[in-house]
Structure formats: structure tokens, C-alpha cells
Amino acid sequence: MTEIKDNNNLSAGPDTAGMTLDVIEIQKLLPHRYPFLLIDKIVELNGEESGIALKNVTMNEPFFQGHFPGRPVMPGVLLIEAMAQTAGAIVLEHHSENAGKLVFFMSIDKARFRKPVVPGDSVYFHVKLLQKRPPVWKYWAEAHVDGKKVAEAEIGAMLIDEKAAG
């Protein structure tokens, strides 16, 4: 599988190369809100080809109340969801014709969790386009803490009209 080692191997797209998005701009793209918006900022956006989002994990996260008392660990499924949110924001930001559309998470393949994510960690979600057949996109995604890979997965998503979603 394609491993994302650093920012130098991420190819630039035509419209959004070098862009960043703050949480307010992310909320204009994604329907997610607290406590389920799991990315704080897009720190690098290279068209639809790739991007990097940031999540600063704090002890105040609601999921730490039960996962696990006395030894808080961010659930792996939420790392995957944050990867999917990163990819979704990239697709929606890159294509102006996607206004009024939602990104639905379709698939997870090759998921691996390598190290726990704990309060105080800054998690960087790197995503890179593998395949595009609109309305379906596939991305390779990795989560990194302190420059080390903590999780990875191949994720698939589909764009649908917001009105069709019900």
C-alpha cells in the first residue's frame, strides 16, 4: 500500500494548493458538529489529491469518560472517522459543483492501529487520493502523532445530494 512518509510526496491539485481551512470553514463543508466534528483544522490542502488535518486531543473529549476510565485512549473508530472527515472536506472544498452535497462514508479497508492516541496528543490525519470515479472517491489515510504513524486505513466515500439524503 502507498505509505505517506512526509509532505513532499503529496501532489498538488489545481485549485487549492497550499490552502488551509480553520474550523469555521470546515463547518461550512461538513455537517458534523460537537462532539462529532473530529478535525480542528486542515493544515494543508492540495486540490483533491491530498491534505492534512489536525486534531488536538484533550482530556475534555466526551469519549474519554468511558474509554477507558483511568487510562484514556481515543477509540480507533474515531480515528477512522476523522480520516473520513478529512477526505470529505477535501472533496467538497475542491469541487465547487459539490455545493449542497454530502459525503457519506462507504468503506474501510486495511485498517491498522499501531499506537494509542491519548490526551495531549496532536494527531495529523494525512490523506492521499487513490481512485476517483464520481460520485465515489477512495483515499489512503494515515494518522500521525509526533511524526510516528499511529493508524492507517483505506477509506471510501460517496457524494450524494443533500436533499436525497432525507
Q: Where are the regions that the model predicts?
A:
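Mixed-charge, glycine-accented linear interaction segment located at domain edges/termini
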Residues: 132, 136-138, 142-166
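Intrinsic-disorder/low-complexity, polar/charged segments enriched in Ser/Thr/Lys/Arg/Asp/Glu/Gln
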Residues: 37, 48-52, 122-124, 136-138, ...
